[in-house]
Amino acid sequence: MKSLLPISSLLVLLGSASVSAADLNIPMSFEYLALDGKKVESSVFNHKSSLELAPGTHKVAIRYHEMVEDDFSDSQTFVKSSPFIVTLEVDGDHQYYLQAAEGKVVKKPKVFAQNPQVVLTRADKGQVNYQVTNTNIEEESFVSRLFSGNQAVDVSGTAATATGVAVAATPAPTSAQVAVSATATTSPTDASKATGANPQQMLQYWWLQADEKTRKEFMSWAISQL
């Protein structure tokens, strides 16, 4: 019986520590790149929807990416923004949510990617102290880096460096935006040209043609190859 009190006290302490962290949640159309100077392991094949944040000020690099209908064909193409950095002041075990300023549905993804406007809210409707700064860092697509031998810009690494630099900025309830440039990949080739296309184009083409089940199976295989 003498050991019950210390063990109970320890459990209380552990329980208190476990609930002290907050979570930052993002939609599928956004991707984490870095947190406080460190890369975040995430990709189009393995989306990370939340980050655990301890109390204090954090810098998170995020990017918007979406698949949209091509203007000149019946196929689809990818559009993505340059990274933007969210400086967030965490003051408790809150659930934070990031979304586009216009709402859950982005009506014009290509326009949005050129200058992403986002807002952060809390599940308890409390005030959120944060600041958003856009960058003009660009990167080749995941597929391009997977199949090409050239030296692509490491956006995650650059973003990690950016989030690791201390910035004297006063967090504000609203976001401050800077112009951002978007990078859209070339439209996938059609079936008649797929045979003569490079590996990147072929993979992109068949990905767009596959159904949901096939995509999930491919994602599982691709992750196992990384």
From Swiss-Prot:
InterPro entries: UPF0319 (IPR018635). Belongs to the UPF0319 family. This is UPF0319 protein SO_1816. Keywords: Signal. It comes from the Bacteria. It comes from Shewanella oneidensis (strain ATCC 700550 / JCM 31522 / CIP 106686 / LMG 19005 / NCIMB 14063 / MR-1). HAMAP family: UPF0319. Pfam families: DUF2057. Residues 1-21 form the signal peptide.
